[in-house]
Amino acid sequence: MMEHPENSEEYKGLTVNAGIEQPSMVNPYLKLRKKPRRREYSVDEFVDGIVKGNVTILSQAVTMVESLKPEHQAIAQEVIEKCLPYSGNSVRIGISGVPGAGKSTSIDVFGLHVLEKGGKLAVLAIDPSSERTKGSILGDKTRMEKLSVHPKAFIRPSPSAGSLGGVARKTRETIILCEAAGFDKIFVETVGVGQSETAVHSMVDFFLLIQLAGTGDELQGIKRGIMEMADGIVINKADGSNIEKAKLAAAHFRNALHLFPTPDSGWTPKVLTYSGFYGLGIQEIWEMVDEYFEFVKKNGYFDYRRNEQAKYWMYETINEHLRDSFYNNPTIETMLAAKEQAVLNGSQTSFVAAKQLLDTYYQLLK
């Protein structure tokens, strides 16, 4: 095809208009507008706002907790320390289940039910993150349609950033801040994959496992450890033609639980059916939860579990700081690449390479 037909004798009658340049899709005046800077609060302002129940300040404090910047971490740790005396007065419930079990929809219904009795609810929804990009869907809030607009509810979807089992590294600190802000009920939802349940179990008082009926072998793919952690198991979507399947699934789970030793709490986990979509069976689930708390507070296990969790997180924090200190050391960073290559080409064993790295690190500490 000829590039400029207007210059050819063959097309001498052809005229070409210059045309009109299309305007930019970006409003040029936006560049002139100054972005409003988010106000930076002092530690005392953070604490005062949180204790007074200011959700805006609470959200900013949680952002500081999740930040990887050292200056933000320093402020966050001070805020947490000062909020600690106001925490510990909530009911912490972990909610997990296979992907597609309807966790977010169920939390929407559960949350509205507990808020009818009074109090405030914080939902910490842990979204799956990509192991490659560390990106997160952060879509849980959109699936909690009614709860997300409730004045007494605070929903905080947090990216798991590839941490252990998909659980956000700073969830426990966020729980402390939410409790200090007056939220007396805390829900922690896990991604339902990997080892996330173990981490959540170590920061909640009651662990609720949501399962589905009518998916074939109901017990297939459920790890023994997760079953042992559950304080209650509920079968979702028990409605319509699925009711009988849900009852059968519940029977399978009850039989399986009989094979496990009695939990340290002395509580025998119950299995119930419900429909999150239609809101059926919700009352019975929360009667079970209330019964559990009455049981463990009476026999002293509630306080024992809280103390064990505090001890666990002390060791986890130590491990985390030691790990960060090691991997962020400039000398170690340089050595790691060389040692990794030595292991890959077979010139060194994994154990020798690791020992040399650790010996170097210990020498640097002297």
Stretch-by-stretch model annotation:
Residues 137, 174, 199, 203, ...:
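Alpha-helical scaffold elements adjacent to nucleotide-binding pockets in ATP/GTP-utilizing enzyme cores
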Residues 232, 238-295:
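Canonical P-loop GTPase G-domain recognition
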Residues 1-85, 333, 337, 354, ...:
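Non-catalytic terminal/linker segments enriched in charged/polar, low-complexity residues
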Residues 42-96, 101, 105-196, 203-210, ...:
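Nucleotide-state-sensitive switch-loop elements of NTP-binding domains
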Residues 58-60, 273, 284-362:
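Long, well-ordered amphipathic alpha-helical subdomains in the mid-to-C-terminal portions
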Residues 213-244:
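Flexible active-site lid/hinge loop adjacent to a nucleotide/diphosphate
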Residues 142-143, 219-224, 259-263:
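Short beta-strand/turn micro-motifs at beta-sheet edges
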Residues 43-48, 101, 234-239, 270-275, ...:
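Short hinge/gating elements
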